[in-house]
């Protein structure tokens, strides 16, 4: 983990006694204050008695401890991956093919949430009446307040609107127990193609996802992948993979990440018409400001020089001030000559 203010780098995938993991670790997620880091790992030496495959762990950087997250409410070990954590580090959502609660009888991977304070594990990928999905659920995300879980699935039994095997985006409210179909248009009609990889604002109001569906917005009539935002309060769905002038992207857009308040969404796009600074089909990082419908190129270097190669894996900080991404570009900073993918951070170009 890199502390950008102190200029220090800390190894996170270690046991409580500081022993380095004996296998691969990845997919980290960090609490708002940086104290807790959850990650998945194939290592068997991070906690005592771990002999299974991939698990989710949590590192407390202040206490210097590492704990296993993928357990049931009786502390019986399971397995899992793809963690997503609440701002305070109390709740950790993860994806698991294990039966960690009695109600999970579908024999398929599902989304779970671990409450580290109460020591309980609950199933999140289920319908409002508690019915588990009838097919595969993909890894999802947890809202910053720990209340909402979003994911995409091919299940047809989570909503009366869903009667096909397309991938659809859902949101589960852990407080009310209700589950809501998200990949719908403003009129409430379900998307006519699959939708993928949602992310959610801290309060659960805004959910961003991408889809090739052509009926989610009147601005979209092609089958290219585009990024949309669902406003659950106003029941609207908005196309955001478009330029500041409202011109829709002419190539694929995907992989959104949303700020805590839902104002900013970053995403990847191969479109060449989203910014006057971009005239090629390389994958670039963009920031869309929902408050004024502006779209700005973010994968730029000194003097706003556009990256000379592909960028990928983008995310935005909770406060919306910093955008991080991976890039093969060698002109984003001085003396980047290794010819490999590197991790970069830039100030949100929309924020002055």
Outline where the language-model segments fall:
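Conserved "turn/edge" positions that cap or connect secondary-structure elements
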Residues: 1-352
